[in-house]
Design a protein with these regions (language model features):
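Low-complexity repeat regions of mature extracellularly deployed or surface/particle-associated proteins
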Residues: 1-191
């Protein structure tokens, strides 16, 4: 995994990432009565992140993922919860190129045959406040926010692996609490 950045300068990136391994992240929480619980797991076979300000960015990257699986699992078991979050994010290939007030040129190639799974489970006896369960799985993704200047984008994505997202809440009662349960599965994504 790679991270770069620039402040009032030029950033030129030529990056290749190849992963033939599986990637796993697991978070397991067993608690009684806490004020707030936030639990999360994140897994990525290949990840590239860049953040720049008032810079010229030329980012060229290639990401190839051929491993069997990228899996993130979050399990929270809690007797009494006041505000509780269980979240999982899993990806085969992920790239984020953020630039503010500077020209950005992006050329990305992302391929994956890796199966991706994001599982988030919350089991709670009773809760108040907010109970949030979120699972997000994506094969290949590029996020490219660019504020205040021009951007040129050339992205090609190919995902042949399966993508699964599962968010689950099991609870017996709420003391006026709110619930948000969300799952998202995406093969290829560009934002």
């Amino acid at each position: 995994n790679t991270a770069t950045g620039a402040d009032h300068g030029d950033l030129t990136v030529q990056l290749r990432q190849d992963a033939s391994n599986s990637s796993y992240a697991t978070t397991d929480v067993d608690a009684c009565c806490t004020g707030a619980t936030v639990a999360g797991a994140s897994s990525a076979a290949n990840a590239y992140g860049s953040s720049s300000t008032t810079s010229t960015v030329d980012a060229q990257y290639e990401q190839n993922s051929t491993g069997a699986e990228s899996r993130a699992t979050t399990d929270v078991y809690q007797y009494r919860a006041y505000d509780v979050t269980a979240a999982s994010t899993a990806a085969a290939n992920s790239a984020t190129i953020n630039n503010e007030w500077g020209y950005t040129a992006i050329r990305g190639r992302q391929t994956s045959s890796t199966d991706v799974a994001a599982d988030a489970r919350l089991t709670v006896g009773t809760w108040s406040g907010v109970a949030v369960v979120s699972a997000y799985g994506v094969g290949t993704t590029t996020l490219a926010p660019n504020i205040g200047s021009d951007m040129v984008v050339d992205i090609a994505q190919m995902n042949t692996g399966g993508v699964d997202a599962n968010a689950q809440l099991n609870g017996s009662s709420s003391d006026g609490g709110q619930v948000l349960v969300s799952s998202t599965a995406v093969g290829n994504g560009f934002t």
